[in-house]
Design a protein with these regions (language model features):
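Short, hydrophobic alpha-helical packing/hinge segments within bilobed ligand-binding/sensory domains
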Residues: 66-67, 96
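Long helical/loop segments within the catalytic core of UDP-sugar-dependent glycosyltransferases
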Residues: 1-58, 101, 108, 112
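Membrane-proximal soluble regions of multi-pass membrane proteins
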Residues: 99-118, 196-232
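Catalytic donor-sugar/metal-binding loop of nucleotide-sugar-dependent glycosyltransferases
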Residues: 33, 58, 67-86
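Membrane-embedded multi-pass helical conduit in multi-pass membrane proteins
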Residues: 136-220
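Active-site donor/metal-binding and catalytic loop motifs
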Residues: 3, 81-96
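Active-site-adjacent helix/loop segment of glycosyltransferases
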Residues: 97-156
Length: 233
């Protein structure tokens, strides 16, 4: 997905995160000979494979669930970089908001409710592909990952100041530094022509703006699939 012309910094950061999730990470898994998550478009299936699973689930991220179901049946999705489907992020704030809520509440719901069961199935079936897809599912959305590591650093360094516990503080700082390095490398290799590096400096503020979205997940999460408001014309 691409940011429409004249889009603000938040949408540009979202475009970067989208490319990392749907191009960079799947290419990495493919280089390791492992499957990828399904992405909602540009997918091809065999009728016999679809007959193995229940399609009538109505999940917010039904594409991701479909990929996990197929993998558990011994049909792991294979990444095909030549299959490209392009679209634009909604230009309206209402459309953007509903789209983000559906994606992120759906991802988090599936991660919390489904990941333990998938991990157990991967171990009992000795299904390495399913284990890899489950580990990939456990990676939270980029904004939430940034917020989590910032919060972890705050707590860890506070513990260091109060109790002298240095190891947790340095581990938390190293994790945050590794995330920053990974983001910088992803931008340099795959997104340099997409956005200037200066836009990435807005990422912490972009993450902070999504705090209400994550609070709503805890208080009143979205469970029904709602189509995003599209732009007219």
């Amino acid at each position: 997905m691409h940011a429409p012309a004249g889009a603000g910094l938040a949408v540009q950061v979202a475009e970067f995160a989208w490319r990392v999730k749907n191009l960079v990470r799947p290419r990495g898994w493919a280089r390791l000979g492992l499957p990828c998550q399904l992405m909602g478009a540009g997918m091809a299936f065999g009728w016999r494979d679809l007959a193995l699973i229940d399609l009538a689930n109505g999940h917010l991220v039904e594409d991701v669930k479909l990929g996990l179901d197929l993998c558990q049946q011994g049909k792991p999705p294979v990444f095909c970089p030549e299959a490209v489907v392009s679209s634009l992020f909604p230009a309206s704030q209402q459309g953007l908001g509903s789209q983000r809520t559906r994606w992120e509440h759906g991802h988090l719901s599936l991660m919390l409710a489904d990941a333990p069961r998938r991990a157990l199935a991967a171990v009992t079936q000795r299904n390495g592909s399913l284990l890899a897809m489950t580990l990939d599912l456990l990676v939270p959305p980029l904004a939430l990952l940034v917020l989590s590591l910032l919060g972890l650093n705050l707590v860890a360094w506070l513990a260091y100041l109060l109790f002298g516990l240095a190891a947790p503080a340095w581990i938390a700082l190293c994790a945050l530094a590794l995330l920053g390095l990974a983001v910088a490398l992803a931008w340099a290799r795959f997104c340099r022509e997409l956005i200037p590096f200066s836009v990435l400096l807005y990422a912490p503020f972009y993450a902070a703006r999504k705090v209400p979205l994550y609070l709503r997940f805890l208080i009143k999460r979205q469970v029904e699939w709602v189509r995003s408001k599209r732009d007219e014309g």
